[in-house]
Amino acid sequence: FHDGSDEVPLFDRDGTRQLELNLIWLNKVCEFAKKHNKIPIFWDDMPLKHAGVYKPMFNDKISKKEVDDIWEKNEVSLMKFIEKFPKNAIYMRWNYQKSNTYGNQKAMDWYTENGLNVMGATAGQTRWTLMPQNQSNISQIKSFAVNSIEKKLEGLLLTLWDDDSPHFELYKRGIAAFGQFAWSGDKESIDEFKTIYRHRTYGSKFSNNEFAFIDKLENPVGLWLNMLLSKEGWRPGLSKKKDPIVTDIIELPDLNNKGLWSKKYSEKIKNANESLLISNEVEQIINYLLNNNSKNKYTLEVYNQVNELVKFSAKAILALEKLDISQTVDQIDYKKTSLKEIKDLQNEFDYLRINFEKTYSKTRILNKPDYYILDQDHHSHPANQTINFDWQFLSEILFLKKLKNLDNHEKL
């Protein structure tokens, strides 16, 4: 029985402190779960946060002595109410990026030393957009799995968060890694696991590093996130902005100030070139797999659509650079070519979106019903920003709208 009260704010009330209030609630839930023959599972944030020992779990820069000092000072707050900690619950010690910190290990040990059941919770997907990254978080999955085995804990949980809604096909390598290391511990290295994964997923002919396209794709996807945005732009919040085309979308070249845009956005241009180079390599690998009888073709098709979307943004930046530079070159044909590339972006995107939606819709419902209630609070979960599938392409859609306002095209 999963209780999700970890994000509920608490305030002191009638002389009762936050930690004690949280424990009162946990005990009520545990009594309810026991009556229904269920085992309650809690995220353990609140007790540790209210006691002041929370931050060291996520800080790998502080020394063991500093962590011990924090615990020596604040553990008394936990021990004051130790008898009120429910014994029939599992305390879920989540840590998705820093599971091997001394602070995290110390917190887990505290539970077991005080007769409480604790499990670790790692993640195959957190808040990455478009696809899981950090090599599917495999290093963290392995670290937490090995630590849990060494501590003889009863189990380990793999979370797969949908806050940013990548396609579920792209979660599968992280799930496989969790199975591998949770069941087998430290028997294989991460590189050995990746070889095994390629073998089992695509076929024995495709197990070597020549076909390791997933890790390659991570960098272009990371660059894609803000490729078409201004410095202040934020993709998840675009739908809530008053005028995102002005505030969040990258500015366009000023045709009266030749070359200025390219100088200002030299870093984006560099990133776009780098991204496109890698994406072209990824495209070749995926196409080879698709054309040579690999297994799990649908997974490859989804990765291919991710790569196509990433390529579009990089190409758009390079097209703007070409337009900006073409103003400094006395070649009419070159200018006409750069202008045509800009005008063709809308058609390229329309074609891309048709194929993207065709692939994703095989296993995903893209459009919500008209009565669906979108985000109304401070959260900005991408898929909850529009009724239709526009949320996946908001940066691209707004960028293309802005592009239509580019003045003086015909004067080139």
Please identify what each model-predicted range represents:
Residues 1-6:
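Aromatic-residue-lined binding/catalytic grooves and analogous aromatic/hydrophobic interfacial grooves
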Residues 9-412:
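Substrate-binding groove of N-acetylhexosamine-processing glycoside hydrolases
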